[in-house]
């Protein structure tokens, strides 16, 4: 299923079951507190301008704003997510576009964040070049993602293929992600290879185990989920 079609179909169900922040690893139960930890990890301060690429229904944007940020912009490809975001907060600055075709209108940002959206882009070189070009001098990129385990065995490789079919998402290893951004001259200066140790993943576990209505829509055949939550700060 195409990314746009997937989120047009399922975003309302995600919002109902998991709230406004659709992420596998949560640093705190409430979006405001989760985003405060993200701010610390991404070295974001209230004076910064932030761009959220693949912003969902704006949950992270709202969390950042509740922690004092004023200049937050989001981009999503899903019309359904735009509508749901407007219901959460009519004043959210969310723009509907394929990010690779998005018109930045000359805007530049102190921080650009991608939360579990990096693997949706088919041309990573073009994505990374676009992101880097949108940074202000001294700007940084924060990525929170589901990364493939390194050196997967045959069963794990099969699981990754099943996930690709299900989500149309590429799960890169932490080493691959770090290398890809390094090719654009960006160095990893922060992050954790395994966020499961310091976050709550119970909602995600229930989801992939088929213990929720939304999970049962997704996981009738996936045998293994050889991924881990990781985050990266690139400068």
Where are these regions (language model features)?
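N-terminal, positively charged/glycine-rich alpha-helical extensions of SAM-dependent methyltransferases
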Residues: 1-21
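Conserved alpha-helix/loop element of class I SAM-dependent methyltransferases that forms part
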Residues: 28-46
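A short glycine-rich, Lys/Arg-flanked "PGG" loop and its adjoining helix->strand segment in the class I
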Residues: 125-137
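Conserved beta-strand signature within the Rossmann-like core of class I S-adenosyl-L-methionine
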Residues: 139-145
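Short alpha-helix
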Residues: 170-185
